Amino acid sequence: PETRQPASQELESPNPALRHTALERLSDLDQLQTIASEDADSGVRAAALGRYQLLLAGKATDSPPLADRLERLRQDADPQLVDFLLHHAVEPELRLVALEQTTAESTLIEIAVHDPHMDLRLAALERVDEPESLDQIARQSRNRDKRVYRRARERLDALVAEKIRASHIERLCTEMENL
């Protein structure tokens, strides 16, 4: 069923309360994005941003199809939007695309330990490179998720082995220079 879009006169009303109410029926992502950045009233801007995020996350009955939302996310790499979708998007596919755009180590750790979907937990884990972070993930997932725990331990052990190997090579080079 087609949802009723608000009349443009409601969206252009000088009354912020009327514009705010009209946003609840608006599903045009471009228009919401424009209102979120340009409306004179901060409450209307915040409501437009909230509606935009809700639609992109797939939490509204009138959300666009997943393919459209995936494309929009790939085009709009706003860190706040990416973070919102990573935590609130309905479909794991959308959260996975958001994860690909995330660089914050703390967010990657949180997803690796707490996300309800195994694929996202493992994908987040693979993006973590710091030994301390891998150790934290291993400790926090030890009794909850054996696959994540094992993979974190494997990666941590590999990093430690590489560090030992590099230090051994450096020591050998120093010894050879001293001959």
For each feature predicted by the language model, list its residue ranges.
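Alpha-helical scaffold segments
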Residues: 1-179
